[in-house]
Regions:
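Acyl-donor (CoA/ACP) binding surface of acyl/acetyltransferases
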Residues: 1-25, 29-36, 71-189
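Juxtamembrane helix-loop transition sites at the ends of transmembrane segments
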Residues: 49, 55-58, 170, 175
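Hydrophobic residues in alpha-helical segments
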Residues: 30, 39, 61-62
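Conserved GNAT-fold acetyl-CoA-binding loop/helix
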Residues: 34-56, 68
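A short helix-loop-beta-strand connector motif used in the catalytic cores of GNAT acetyltransferases and
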Residues: 57-71
Length: 189
């Protein structure tokens, strides 16, 4: 299993490992309550909090035994607009997570990024299965995953304590490596 992640270029995005120099752009979305509402993290209140997250979480991937996280760079304006990662590995199963600045929502950019992560997770990292948990109240995120080939497996009741301080039902979605080998599957659709 390879944990170093290559840089990947898509039609509109550059996906590359997180660096400390990304802190200003990352703070703009980590401090936004809209972005953080379906996550277990609270909005960041100052840039130091974001820098500490980069240092203690994103740059410790090797020690934690997970692949490097990517920032999502929008090629049109060369801004870091989000990040995504395979944040948990259990054998050959990886759990993914992602978030994006709201100015870039509803443009198909997260689908583009998640599709690239799925390809890298199976081809580069060597995973057999990838999973994501999505708050029931967040159908847009589930739609991103469905577009990328994930299927809903079920709903886990009151699974996650989110930033609002309440437990939420979460949809478990997954994709299998064998599925992407079928002719009916295309990540670039």
């Amino acid at each position: 299993m390879r944990l170093d992640m290559p840089c990947v270029e898509t039609a509109h995005l550059l996906l590359r490992p997180v660096e400390e120099g990304d802190v200003c752009d990352m703070f703009t979305y980590y401090s936004d309550p809209l972005v953080m509402r379906y996550l277990s993290l609270h909005p960041h209140t100052d840039i130091e909090e974001t820098l500490n997250s980069i240092r203690s979480y994103f740059l410790t991937w090797e020690k934690r035994g997970v692949p490097q996280a990517w920032v999502i760079v929008h090629k049109h304006d060369d801004k870091v607009i989000g990040n995504l990662d395979i944040h948990t590995i259990d054998g050959d199963i990886g759990e993914i997570g992602y978030l994006m600045h709201p100015d870039y929502w509803n443009q198909g950019l997260m689908r583009e990024a998640v599709s690239a992560l799925v390809k890298a997770g199976f081809a580069h990292v060597g995973l057999r299965r990838m999973e994501a948990y999505v708050a029931v109240e967040h159908p847009a995120s589930a739609a991103v995953l469905k577009h990328c080939g994930f299927v809903q497996e079920g709903i886990l009741r009151k699974l996650a304590l989110l930033s609002d301080g309440r437990y939420h039902d979460m949809v478990l979605m997954s994709i299998l490596k064998e599925y992407i080998l079928t002719e009916s599957f295309r990540l670039d659709k």
